[in-house]
Amino acid sequence: MIVNDNQNILYVGIDFGYSKTVIMTSRGKSLSLKSLVGYPKDFVGLARLGRPYLVGDEAFEMRSYLHLRNPLLDGLLNPISEQDIDVTRHFISHIIKCAEPAAGEKVFAVIGVTPRFTAANKKLLLKLAQEYCQNVLLMSAPFLAGNSIGKASGSIIIDIGAWTTDICAMKGRIPRPEDQSSIAKAGSYIDERLKNSILERYPALQINANIARMVKEQFAFVGRPQLVAACEFRSAGKAVRCDVTEQVRAACESPFAEIAERIGAVLCVVPPEDQALVLKNIVITGAGAQIRGLPEYVKSMLAPYGDARVSIANEPLMEACKGALSMAQEIPPHFWGQL
C-alpha cells in the first residue's frame, strides 16, 4: 500500500453496491453497510427516531417505522424526481461522514460502480459526490477488483453482486465499453426465483424476499448438492420445516447460462492468441462468489470455449473496495484535477 504523505488528504475507496456499500480509508477504517435510506412513515416514526432519516443497517433495523429507499433502482441511479436524488445525496453524505475526515482535510475518493451505469448516471453521481469530496473518480467495480487481486492483465473478472453480474476483461489499462458486459441477473434475481419456486412447491408458506434471501445465504449451491437445505418457515403463523434443496439449486443455477454467454462475448474481445491463457485465469468476486460449487460449475458452463480455470478471490466481498482505495492512493494528487 502506498503511504499517504499528504496529511491534508484522506483517500477513500468505495464499492457502491445495490445491496451493500463498502468503504475503506487511508487511515485503515473499513466498514460495510446496507445501501438503504429510511424516511419516517408518519409523526410516530419521526418522534421515535428524532431524525429526518436513517441510513444503512440502522434503517433496516428500524424498518417498521420507515419507508425504505435504495439509491439504486434496477442497479442504476434513479433520478426521476428531486426526492429520488435526495436519497442518493443523503446516502453519500452518510458514507463520507463514516470515513471520518478530519477538520480541514480534503477527501479524494474513488467509487467503484457497475459498468451498467449510464453516462447520465455517472454525471449525477459525480455531481452529488463532489458536494462532500474535493476530488472524485468513478471506475468499473470488476476492474478495481481485478487490480486488487493482482490480475491487471490477462484475466477475466466476474463480479456477482445483488442486482448485476459484471464481467471485465483485464488488459492492463482502464477498460473500454467493449471490454465489459453487465447482466441484471445476480443475487436479487436468484432471491425472486427461489421465492417463487418454494411457493410453487409449498403454496401455504409465508415467504417474502427477505426470507428467500436468508435461505439463499445459508444454503446457496450449484451443481451436486453438498448439504440438505432443510429450513424452518411459517405457515398460517405456525412453524413448519421444509426441504428446499432442489429449489435452492435451481434458483442459484438460473442466471449462469446467460452469464456464460456474456463471458464468451468478453473473451472474444481478447486477442485470439491470448484467449486460451485468459480462459485459464478467471476470478469470481462479489457476494455471489460465496455460492458453493461455483468454480467447477462455471468451468463446466465454459467448456465450449476450451479448458477454463475458475477461482474465487481471497476476499470476494472486499476486493473492489480495496482496489478503489489502492487506485485513489496511486494517483498523484496533482493529476486528480486532470481526470
UniProtKB/Swiss-Prot annotation:
It is found in: Cytoplasm; Cytoplasm, Cytoskeleton. Its EC number is 3.6.1.-. It holds the Pfam family MreB_Mbl. GO terms for molecular function: ATP binding; ATP hydrolysis activity. Changing D15N: Loss of ATPase activity. This bacteria makes up to 20 cubo-octahedral magnetosomes of about 45 nm in diameter which contain membrane-bound crystals of magnetite (Fe(3)O(4)). Despite the presence of Ala-141 (where Glu is expected) this protein has ATPase activity. This is MamK-like protein. It comes from Paramagnetospirillum magneticum (strain ATCC 700264 / AMB-1). The gene is mamK-like.
